[in-house]
């Protein structure tokens, strides 16, 4: 039974510096069980640093942390999880060649009842929170949304009752985002305390009960979500009035740049990833592709970019078929095409290299 009389978390006077850079200064923040708190702020406002202190990755220079009304000292992530705090990072901490079940069980301590019994516990937890996942599926075959579900299961399996999610929707489709929100609402109903780090105003208003706004390392204000709006949150976040209107310029004399004709793709496991896809993309146009996880968005993008082979069909760039060509060959043809993958860090960047080299 979760303690409903004390705050789940209470931070007082938290200050953290990195050299001369002050990331957080005299931050006071609290959250109760059965509540979703959004931590809102621009990039560099101190949101992630504050939560890294709470999850044991950093240690505060000044201030106190209380869990369930008791002062605690969190010096590493292991201590945090023992106190019931679980953090789902923006870049997932999963072993790609392991299955979902193996990742969930990896590193668990205490009495081990056998793989069959432990899997039964995982399935019971899945049903409790509405978390749907194929537990024998390898991580490298999963969409970003599925990987995130595994991360959530990892912390729940370890007994977390306080969940921190760092930019959880940054690489999710709208459908995956709505599915995540359904899961979070169910967790809230079960009495969990949830903190979401974000800068997406519409999502803040859709999911949270309260909003804490950070700017330059300070908590500027904490507001009740039903009593605020996008305009107020924007002004609190950036410190000045700002227009939310977008003026879209009209493009004339548009011509077809990319044409996909009867495109079919078979996945690594032999299933059909795409079946007879047809569309045109014109210059000066933004084409949106929507669908739930596993509907073929990844296969479509990777096939156009030359990262997957098509079974049948054509991809015409200015009437030239680029199917079967590698990304290098496409570039050598003088075709200016960029591909930003859904897993930006794992597939799109070299983490050990700096920005210029990447």
Predicted segment positions?
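Glycine-rich phosphate-binding loops of nucleotide-dependent enzymes
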Residues: 2-358
């Amino acid at each position: 039974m979760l303690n409903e009389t004390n705050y789940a978390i209470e931070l007082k006077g938290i200050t953290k510096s990195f050299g001369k850079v002050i990331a957080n200064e005299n931050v006071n923040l609290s959250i109760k069980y059965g509540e979703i708190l959004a931590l809102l702020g621009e990039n560099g406002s101190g949101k992630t640093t504050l939560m890294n202190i709470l999850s044991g990755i950093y240690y505060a220079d000044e201030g106190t942390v209380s869990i369930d009304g008791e002062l605690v000292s969190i010096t590493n992530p292991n201590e945090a999880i023992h106190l019931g705090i679980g953090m789902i990072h923006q870049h997932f901490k999963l072993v790609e060649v392991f299955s979902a079940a193996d990742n969930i069980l990896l590193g668990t301590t205490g009495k081990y009842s056998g793989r069959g019994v432990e899997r039964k516990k995982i399935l019971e937890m899945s049903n409790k929170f509405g978390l749907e996942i194929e537990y024998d599926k390898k991580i490298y075959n999963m969409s970003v949304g599925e990987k995130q579900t595994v991360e959530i299961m990892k912390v729940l399996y370890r007994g977390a009752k306080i969940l921190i999610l760092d930019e959880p929707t940054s690489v999710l489709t709208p459908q995956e985002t709505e599915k995540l929100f359904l899961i979070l609402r169910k967790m809230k109903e079960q009495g969990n305390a949830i903190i979401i780090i974000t800068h997406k105003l519409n999502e803040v208003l859709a999911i949270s009960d309260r909003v804490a706004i950070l700017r330059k390392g300070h908590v500027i204000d904490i507001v009740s979500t039903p009593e605020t709006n996008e305009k107020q949150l924007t002004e609190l976040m950036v410190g000045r009035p700002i227009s939310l209107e977008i003026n879209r310029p009209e493009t004339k004399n548009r011509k077809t740049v990319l044409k996909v004709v009867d495109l079919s793709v078979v996945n690594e496991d032999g299933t059909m990833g795409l079946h007879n896809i047809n569309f045109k993309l014109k210059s000066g146009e933004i084409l949106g592709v929507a669908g739930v996880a596993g509907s073929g968005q990844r296969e479509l993008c990777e096939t156009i970019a030359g990262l997957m082979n098509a079974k049948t069909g054509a991809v015409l760039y200015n009437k030239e078929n680029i199917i079967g060509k590698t990304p290098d060959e496409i570039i050598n043809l003088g075709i200016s095409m960029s591909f930003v993958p859904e897993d930006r860090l794992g597939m799109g960047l070299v983490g050990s290299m700096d920005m210029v080299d990447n």
